[in-house]
């Protein structure tokens, strides 16, 4: 897992061409004007999902992990807590669904506040819980870039 500000994205170019393309998209796109939906960047290798939602209490969140895609989660506006734990010590809540590339878990995690202009990268070995309210519920607009691992 990596959490940082977009202005430091150049530090992560060595993570591969697809991650680099993801950061280029974040820097070159007027993100505030993007409507919720799916945006193709490089076919099914790299695509973006824009969503707007209200953050929720931790009790309503689920730890999740993906096998085929890395998540580059960028907060366009608002702020949220993102939970994280290394994959391995959790109990499976819902088994892996290949069609959605998602598996749900329960277990220990730690939280970090991610605000507008910040990103989090979650790799397949990172269990994460996004969208959690840092206190009371608030509105968030977020772009998640899905980066194929192979």
What are these regions (language model features)?
Residues 68, 104-109:
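Short alpha-helix capping/helix-loop boundary micro-motifs
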Residues 43-45, 65-69, 75-77, 97, ...:
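Short connector loops at helix/strand junctions that flank enzyme active sites
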Residues 113-132:
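Conserved metal-binding segment of the jelly-roll/cupin
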Residues 68-80, 88, 95-100, 146-147:
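Short, conserved beta-strand element in jelly-roll/cupin
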Residues 48-66, 76-90:
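Conserved short histidine dyad/triad with adjacent acidic residue
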Residues 2-49, 57-60, 65:
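A short, N-terminal "cap"/entry segment at the start of jelly-roll beta-barrel domains
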Residues 119-121, 137-150:
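A short hydrophobic beta-strand segment most commonly corresponding to one strand
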């Amino acid at each position: 897992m990596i959490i940082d500000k977009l202005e430091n994205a150049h530090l992560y170019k060595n993570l591969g061409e697809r991650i680099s393309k993801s950061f280029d998209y974040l820097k070159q796109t007027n993100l505030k004007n993007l409507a919720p939906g799916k945006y193709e960047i490089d076919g099914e290798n790299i695509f973006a999902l824009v969503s707007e939602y209200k953050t929720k209490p931790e009790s309503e969140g689920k730890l999740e992990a993906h096998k085929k895609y890395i998540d580059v989660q960028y907060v366009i506006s608002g702020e949220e807590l993102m939970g994280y734990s290394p994959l391995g010590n959790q109990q499976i809540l819902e088994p892996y669904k290949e069609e959605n590339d998602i598996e749900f878990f329960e277990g220990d995690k730690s939280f970090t506040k991610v605000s507008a202009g910040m990103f989090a990268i979650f790799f397949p070995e990172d269990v994460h819980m996004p969208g959690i309210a840092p206190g009371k519920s608030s509105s968030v607009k977020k772009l998640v870039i899905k980066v194929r691992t192979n």
